[in-house]
């Protein structure tokens, strides 16, 4: 999914052979939408249109399958690009289905068709109650057919993990995850990919290892070709985010904190400012790690953040409120609660954390803070009700990996029930948690 590097490679191929139709096709393809960035900025749309024209111009030199891919890609773009890309993306997926029917023995064609279908519902292949969304069964069937043709096809294994990870049976992709571990050892994102299935199947230590390897690869690549730019920054951050989360779930607090701090430090300030609506929530992650391990003094020692990070500024108050409540400093906790409510109101509605809005995540934090504070004040039932509300809101968040809330609310609710000697209720909460986080 390193589209920038792919474009550079295709451009070099086109420089060496200006009449190579597939080099121009590749540039046009890589400028298009994908599940992690379902947009086409105007400069990318213009370049895609130009390169598509060159691919069509030189298509006579291409094979029949390549000509079919070029013809299908022509359905994906228009000049000028419309405000609503939906009809173009659907037309491209439909065209790729026909190409796959014509060339059912070509695994690349099948993988590109599956991706075109996934792009119609990015990160939304399964409903909250575990039912496949429209098109999901076709995606899975296509990828399984591709893997019968080429079991080690990198893209098909990659997409298969994404296709089933949010399903009720993520273990379907365990074999694909294991194949991915050493399939492309120089590509950090693909080294990391098995952890998407590991953490859904309770293989937490394997998830730690996969992401440790991925982080080592991304650092080695930075030494070879320079620091990452653009969206690649966030792919690298994602590896460390996933590593920290898996470390949290295995009780490795120091390891989690090491990598979450490194993740934050490696995002340049200028990139934070330019991409604040995407990056803001990443910067808040150290608070969740510290809360997980009850490191209250460290939470309270962290400084405030710039105004261009409104979510992190708000989350800081929530974390401080929980820390003060845990230390029995109720008045200070109330002050932070008031500050959190005021700061959360300033978070723009379009700020996001992965597949969720920052405001939706703030709502989980609001109920967590209220629950912890009420519980510490001795209002046990009220506190438990707020924690249960936090659980409900966490469950309603859209699927993402790592989860948008990496401090499982059921763990806090279960601990509170244990302290209240409501052991049967606590046991049920923990059993429910194991369904979500085995």
What is each stretch, according to the model?
Residues 4-41, 102-111, 272-273, 343-345, ...:
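Short, charge-rich amphipathic alpha-helical segments embedded
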Residues 13-16, 100-102, 147-149, 179-186, ...:
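Solenoid-like repeat scaffolds
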Residues 19-34, 60-82, 105-127, 150-164, ...:
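Amphipathic alpha-helical repeat scaffolds of TPR domains
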